[in-house]
Amino acid sequence: MEAHYATVFEKNADAIPNEIALVCGENIRTWKEYDDRAARLATLLTSYGLGSDSKVGLYLHNSNEFLEAQYSVFKVAGVPINVNYRYKEEELIYLLDNSDSEAVFFQGCYAQQIESIKDKLDKVKVFIQVDDGTPQLECAENYEQIISSNEPMERFERSEDNIYMLYTGGTTGMPKGVMYTHGGHLGAMLNTAGAWGMIPIQEKIEIENVSKEVLRISEEESLTVSIPACPLMHGTGMWLGAMIPHLVGGAVVTLPKLGFDPDELLKEVERTKANNIVIVGDAFAKPLMDALDKAESDGNPYNLESVNTVISSG
């Protein structure tokens, strides 16, 4: 079994099909649904000629769709490209052109930005709009219609040498794509999961045994539930808040509201019984502590008994 994110996720979906993989508000997806929806999106990507090492922009907010779209790119052995939704037109053009993106998933609220730059993106073959109540762009495919009108792509063997890439934030110069192999990156994330107690620590965690261990945990204990409070478009949110828990069969809870609302996070921790919270420094930690203190002083403290770890990085 190759050390590739798509392959590990597929094995997890087979092992624990009815366990929860994604939660965003009232929208809940099981591992079976997560895998099926990503496979249908992958069919659309292949119909436009995308495949191994094809780059796909993810111009999205934290959501189930962000993670489904990324999984679909992994399935075709492609390379998801994180797009900062705060970028202006010239920055978007630079990033999507520099990354050689051939497809772009975008949040519906950014339809106007896509409309204004699409003719300058000669390499992009298809735009895919995630519906958020914004009128559908004529030049774009509709996300949910793709899922309803396509069959799941058949699985195939991939390589652990396939590229995974993360673009830097561009705080010192223009954004740059940092490249990893799936095997190297996945191995590091899996070892981190072991260090956090999400999966038993071994001298070397064998990829072949991950889904077996995930099944055992689901039957004998409970699978992890993680909330990335920070954007998935950055490494901290994606790697620590989503990729690691999904490697070990856990659920990822995303907060649909833009900006950080500590009370929204704490209420979601209570509702979903989250075990892990991922934040970025004092910009998150201080408001979080203030909200906890206020709730305590008001006589309505939050129930955080489910929380094992709060991880801050970045």
Residue ranges and their predicted role:
Residues 1-3, 135-162:
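Flexible, low-complexity linker/hinge segments
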Residues 18, 149-169, 173-174, 216-225:
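Conserved pre-ATP/AMP-binding loop-to-beta segment of ANL
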Residues 18-63, 70, 88-93:
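Conserved AMP-binding/adenylate-forming core of the ANL superfamily
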Residues 30-32, 163-208:
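Conserved AMP-binding A3 loop
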Residues 47-48, 75-145:
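Structural core segment of the AMP-binding/adenylate-forming
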Residues 61, 106-116, 132, 230, ...:
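Adenylate-forming
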Residues 61-81, 85-89, 97-103, 224-225, ...:
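A short helix-loop-beta submotif of the ANL/AMP-binding
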